[in-house]
UniProtKB/Swiss-Prot annotation:
Homooctamer. The light-modulated chloroplast enzyme, encoded by a nuclear gene and expressed primarily in leaves, is responsible for the reassimilation of the ammonia generated by photorespiration. It catalyses: L-glutamate + NH4(+) + ATP = L-glutamine + ADP + phosphate + H(+). Its EC number is 6.3.1.2. Belongs to the glutamine synthetase family. This is Probable glutamine synthetase leaf isozyme. It comes from Pinus pinaster (Maritime pine). Keywords: ATP-binding, Chloroplast, Ligase, Nucleotide-binding, Plastid.
Amino acid sequence: DVNWPLGWPVGGYPG
């Protein structure tokens, strides 16, 4: 996912 913090580092970015 593209979400923070759950989407990072699992397929997203800290933003």
